[in-house]
């Protein structure tokens, strides 16, 4: 039976945190089929060993993509090239290896909303941001509305990737030659082109800010990738306000 939801976990040198991430995924209480797709971008720590251990106890179908060379540093769109082709679910949830979900009902809550409302392209929710070295935390964003539109996501990150669940039929629109540094903003905007995003006030995940991770070593060349994003967005949606978006980016 095909899964209803494909959970994507991308990781790089996150052995210290990966167990918390995978445990939170495995703890989801659902009455539908789920698959887990793990992409490791050539970690040099014990991340791959931890993945091997969890494969043995995964309660649902699991697919692994274990790179021999780091793809992110080459600017390769790992989602379109490696991950999305393996997706079988109607919906996609993402949780990076150093983040984790805190509510076992998270997927059920979000999928129920999407199944009942075809006009929504995605759902998101509140998150907690934890600063590992500073021993402090805060809410990701004090958002006070449920219906999120393109203008809402154009200038600000109002929810975190670990809170996001979107329809997989949007995948063909997400292919981009060079993966942007701010891939989440690109993803949120494309989803907002094709329907509103429903936002839950419930706090159901943790975004861990640490020096370890996929974006821990950002160079000027990596930042330059985002210059390709506005043109791609304009290709997808001819009504996309290119110059207004660039004004937001230049202020950021």
Locate the predicted segments by residue.
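Cell-envelope/extracellular polymer assembly enzymes that use nucleotide-activated donors
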Residues: 3-6, 35, 186
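Acidic helix N-cap motif at the loop->helix transition within catalytic regions
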Residues: 19, 45-54
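Short, acidic, metal-binding catalytic loop of nucleotide-sugar glycosyltransferases
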Residues: 23-33
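A conserved acidic beta->alpha catalytic loop
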Residues: 40-49, 69, 96
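Glycine-rich, basic loop-to-helix element that forms the pyrophosphate-binding segment
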Residues: 67-88, 109
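Conserved nucleotide-sugar donor-binding catalytic segment
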Residues: 85, 125, 141-221
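Short aromatic/hydrophobic "clamp" motif used to bind/position activated sugar donors
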Residues: 92
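Conserved donor NDP-sugar-binding/catalytic core segment of glycosyltransferases
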Residues: 105-138
């Amino acid at each position: 039976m095909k899964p209803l939801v494909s959970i994507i976990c991308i990781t790089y040198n996150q052995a210290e945190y990966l167990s918390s991430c995978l445990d939170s995924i495995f703890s989801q209480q659902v009455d539908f089929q789920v698959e887990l797709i793990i992409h490791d971008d050539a970690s040099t720590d014990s991340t791959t060993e931890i993945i091997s251990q969890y494969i043995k106890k995964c309660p649902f179908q699991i697919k692994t993509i274990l790179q021999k060379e780091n793809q992110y540093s080459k600017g390769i769109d790992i989602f379109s090239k490696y991950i999305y082709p393996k997706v079988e679910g109607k919906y996609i949830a993402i949780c990076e290896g150093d983040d984790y979900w805190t509510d076992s009902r998270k997927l059920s809550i979000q999928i129920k909303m999407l199944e009942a409302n075809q006009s929504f392209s995605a759902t998101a929710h509140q998150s907690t941001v934890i600063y590992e070295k500073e021993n402090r935390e805060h809410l990701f964003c004090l958002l006070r509305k449920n219906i999120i539109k393109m203008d809402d996501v154009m200038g600000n990150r109002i929810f975190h990737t670990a809170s996001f669940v979107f329809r997989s039929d949007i995948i063909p629109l997400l292919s981009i030659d060079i993966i942007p540094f701010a891939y989440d903003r690109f993803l949120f905007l494309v989803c907002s082109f094709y329907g509103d995003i429903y936002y839950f006030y419930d706090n159901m995940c943790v975004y861990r800010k640490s020096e370890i991770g996929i974006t821990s070593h950002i160079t000027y060349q990596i930042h330059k990738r985002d210059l390709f994003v506005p043109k791609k967005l304009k290709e997808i949606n001819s009504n996309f306000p290119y110059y207004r978006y660039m004004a937001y980016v230049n202020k950021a």
